């Protein structure tokens, strides 16, 4: 739902996510995010969260690691248990209903945010349904979202040359990309969920004096992992 997020004003007018962790804030609200797995620099993010005075953690799952930094944990329904709208890459709005009723005290995330807005006496939190949220974002009765293009507007990528050492190109397996997939036993047994490996060109392995198939310690910043070296030309 990346297009839906863009249409729904997810691009901030102020600091972006990285800046909010590089310059720690006093309070954070996390929704459906497990920073240890979902952020490119988890050490930076978790460090900022532990410094904060207040962290509100909203998730469909009780994430054990979040107990170290979350002050409040609010249960929200997964997308399968709530109504809503996705906008696909074509720009087509696709609305749906929940497959089953949310369990226990879980509520759809939009309802939790609405109540928080009401408690804080903020304007713009009077929604009574997910359809009302949709209609405000894309317009009532909209089938295709207008004004989309393939341009990379407002995005600047500055890459500094590396004179020494190695660069890590990380791949996130499709069945490890979100909290629900990570907790699906059947998905974790597929070929797409094999253990990660340190893949290197044959010449790089030779230069490092490493043989394919042996365990190697990979470090970046304060993090490290033991991976199996594999030749990949």
Regions found by a protein language model. Give the residues of each.
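Metal- or metallocofactor-binding catalytic centers and their adjacent structured scaffolds
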Residues: 127
């Amino acid at each position: 739902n990346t297009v839906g997020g863009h249409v729904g004003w997810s691009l901030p007018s102020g600091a972006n996510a990285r800046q909010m962790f590089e310059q720690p804030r006093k309070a954070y609200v996390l929704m459906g995010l497990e920073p240890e797995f979902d952020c490119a620099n988890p050490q930076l993010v978790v460090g900022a969260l532990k410094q904060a005075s207040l962290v509100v953690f909203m998730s469909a799952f009780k994430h054990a690691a979040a107990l170290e930094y979350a002050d409040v944990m609010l249960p929200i329904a997964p997308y399968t248990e709530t109504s809503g709208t996705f906008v696909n890459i074509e720009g087509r709005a696709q609305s749906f209903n929940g497959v089953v009723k949310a369990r226990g005290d879980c509520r759809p995330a939009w309802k939790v945010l609405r109540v928080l807005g009401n408690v804080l006496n903020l304007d713009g939190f009077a929604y009574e349904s997910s359809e009302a949220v949709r209609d405000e974002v894309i317009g009532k009765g909209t089938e295709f979202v207008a004004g989309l293009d393939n341009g990379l507007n407002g995005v600047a990528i500055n890459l500094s040359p590396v004179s020494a050492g190695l660069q890590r190109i990380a791949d996130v397996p499709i069945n490890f990309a979100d909290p629900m997939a990570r907790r699906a036993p059947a998905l974790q047994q597929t070929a797409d969920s094999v253990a990660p490996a340190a893949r290197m060109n044959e010449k790089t392995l030779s230069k490092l004096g490493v043989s394919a198939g042996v365990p190697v310690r990979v470090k970046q910043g304060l993090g490290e992992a033991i991976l199996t070296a594999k030749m990949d030309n």
